[in-house]
Amino acid sequence: ALELLHDVSQTPNAHMITRLRLDAELWNPAPQRKPHQNGRPRVKGARRPSPKQRLDDPNTLWTTLEVEHWYGHEKRNVAIYTATCVWYKSGFQPVLIRWVLVRDPQGQYDPQTFLSTHVDHTPEQILTWFVQRWRMEVTFEETRAHLGMETQRQWSDLAIARTTPVLLGLFSLVALMANDLIP
């Protein structure tokens, strides 16, 4: 995951938003190297509290945010904490991220952490884009369950590549026609 995030963060105009583990090792960025300093350049700074530690810390300053379409609800108020840091694991390149810890004040959902490889994204943007991704995943899961998408038994790659778009197109056409027929 870190290798992919690093590659995406180095690509212009490409950003990734995904989940972050609650026990992720987070660090400050590496301090500036002094002129003529000996030794290998540092890749990370001091250790930062993990999202799990922030969640358990009574001094964490939570902000309330209203999110549209949160797990099927029209609008939902959630408590968030956000920060920027470096996500680093030995053997991988460090990745500068903005992470958002989300807690449900009503206690209906487990706490979650999301990250963006673009540190200028706001928490609202990160959560909105993640919710949009969730809706796409639900759509694909429903098409698998109801239309049998990705369960076809073709032998050639070309047949497989053609079948899925045709299934989605036909389903869209039937849905539009049904919408016109039913007042």
What does each of the following model-derived ranges do?
Residues A1-P183:
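Single, function-defining residue in the core of a domain
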